[in-house]
Amino acid sequence: MPLLNDLVPNKSLLCKLWRIDDSEDIMHPNNELNSDDYQIFLSRKANHMKRQFLASRKLISLVDPDLRVDYENNIPLLSDNRNISISHCEDIVTILISENKGIGIDVERINNKVHSIKSKFLNQKEINYLSGYEESRNLTKAWTAKEAIYKALRMPGIIFSENILIEEFNNESTTGIGKFISTNQEKKFKLYFYDLDNYCLTISQEI
């Protein structure tokens, strides 16, 4: 399972990314997992989900072999109280770690199917500026941006098309700005965009 690279958006964020290699056997965790993680591993029914879970734990062990992931209301938190966000899509698995709160990461494969659901996560202004050149890639980039912000917010009841807004960006953009807006609060996020062959990855950090 070769390591692709470390992404370094800024000094306060640690991001590691792996591509799962089907030629490598990682389906037998042996003694690599603690008892809680082993139960989670067993609960994963599909083999690809098991592989993704093991890959995420291997990434964490590269940061610190003694780290473990605890969960509070299904939200992951590292045992040293740092914050973590995890994302995976097919053979790509990535983790984002920071001492700061308000972080999120998401990775998705670029797919034309995103066109059929764009009205569910974009407002009309966003749809307009994202139409045209490299539309599938930019729609996917917007989707990962909103997912990353959603993960950073860690709150229920969010409507992507209304509460999470992405300022205009283009195909060449490597950074952007996103906002969460509700009736009683507003939060602003710095976005970091990465193109990974047929995937889009976005990191969000509250500013």
What do these predicted regions represent?
Residues 1-207:
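Core catalytic alpha/beta fold that binds nucleotide/phospho-ligands
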